[in-house]
Amino acid sequence: EIYFEPDFGFPPDCKVYTEACTREYNPICDSAAKTYSNECTFCNEKMNNDADIHFNHFGECEY
C-alpha cells in the first residue's frame, strides 16, 4: 500500500486546468475530507459544480 504524507503547501491554481484531466494519482484532500485523484479532478469539481469545497492538503484524507 502506498501512503502519501499530507503536505499543507499552497493550494492548487485551478485556473490552469481544463475539463480534461489525466489519470495520474497525486491525491489531494478537500475541506469535506474527500480525496481527489489529483489537482485537476479537485479543481474541476470545485469549478464545474460550483462546489463549496476548499483545499485542505496534498495527500489522501485520513478518515
From Swiss-Prot:
Residues 8-63 form the Kazal-like domain. It is found in: Secreted. Keywords: Disulfide bond, Protease inhibitor, Secreted, Serine protease inhibitor. Its main location: secreted. Disulfide bonds join C14-C43, C21-C40, C29-C61. It comes from the Eukaryota. This is Acrosin inhibitor 1.
